[in-house]
Amino acid sequence: MFRPSILARELGEYDVVNVGAAGTFVVRKPRSRSEFRNALLRKLPFAAELVLFDGGDFLRLEAGNPFAPELSSPDVVRFVGILSKAVSVRVSLPVTFPPDGEWLVRVMESEGQFVFGMYRRHMKTIGYLGQIDKLFGVPATIRNWNTIAAIVRVLKTPPR
């Protein structure tokens, strides 16, 4: 069974911090991007598509607070979709899933490789989140805004 926390420890020379349970890592002692990518791929027990960002990208996300005007409620989760690569296609936003009736997923805006939205806690939501890949034409991974905030906290903490 794959355990991201164990993988983070195995990549100790890079001072990798595992954030959450889905394999989101903060690398606090980076070298070259290609060197880290190769080291990570060698340690993974399966094939994976990796998306690497500079920490400054997440610091700018937090500073810009894309959810500031939106009211929060316990049944609505704010998320960031991270696209596997920048896309040239412009998507007319906002988009809701399902398109009719009460929305379960609402994609509000996009900026570079980041997509911002909200979803309601419902059994059908996961299927609608999968539509983001189709909407933008590239694979996307979804992270709760709380995960982004946790990444920023790690980035703001001095390395060991």
Language model features: what each stretch is:
Residues 1-160:
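Surface-exposed, charge/polar-rich loops and edge strands
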